[in-house]
Amino acid sequence: MKKLITMTSLLVGFLGNMATAQQSSFPTIGKIHRLDPGLDHLIDTTSKIEILGTGYTWSEGPVWVKKGGYLLFSDVPENVIHKWSAAKGIEEFLRPSGYTGTGTYSEEPGSNGLIINKKGNLVSCEHGDRRIAEMPLDKPEQKKTLAHLFEGKKLNSPNDLVQKSSGDAFSQ
């Protein structure tokens, strides 16, 4: 759990530092625990953990969209992906984000892990539709399924993604 908190703090600290270029007064919380001096080469030693938004049920899968200069993250129970930018703050990016059916699916219908692939598309782990999907950032209607079966059985609940430098993606 400590590693998760450390990684979350790292990401929030890094992105928070990027945000200060546009806006200089976000509330702060906690502190960054530097377990390795190498971190100083990645994150400025004066960086703080800044709160960019509140009121989310369960935030997951943050990914920085370098080309657009914004952050995407999932709110899994609310079935939505939010977008944060220094210019506009928080706005809704995609709803539904993981369950596109009708009726109630579960308490975890939305997307979870997110990455930007080598083509610049958003790839999402979708609990509700039990798949890994890809879509152009500016054309969500072109979302397509990349994987939904393993050995002939539907995926249970894809959770997170990582991508190798070759572009190969792996999920758990």
Regions found by a protein language model. Give the residues of each.
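Positively charged n-region of N-terminal signal peptides that target proteins for export
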Residues: 1-4
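Bacterial N-terminal signal peptides
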Residues: 7-16
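Sec/Tat signal peptide C-region and signal peptidase I cleavage site
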Residues: 17-21
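Sequence-structural signature of mature extracellular/luminal beta-sheet repeat domains
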Residues: 22-172
